[in-house]
């Protein structure tokens, strides 16, 4: 069975985090919400608290992931960008030839991790300056 890890940071956008988890789980995909906040409770950009399945410190190296997923939202995307564990996991995933995904503002995290060089990418309107040398 496929396995997806979705990283959550305070300031995430609710629909971008929860809709993919809902659809994937309904489709039989093992989907694990991972908090990077040092606690399982993660607070969205609009004050909704979600309880993650794991904290990043409990999750291992994510080598069993088929996809690492990043929801957008602010300041959630910048919180993800600034977390070295997230960046390292994304880089390992890409080096292994496995998938990474980012929604709305979160492609800025992929750019920061150096994963968008010469690749097509999209981002929330007006944030294209965060994509580095990606093809926008």
Place the predicted regions along the sequence by residue:
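Active-site alpha/beta core segments
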Residues: 42-43, 59
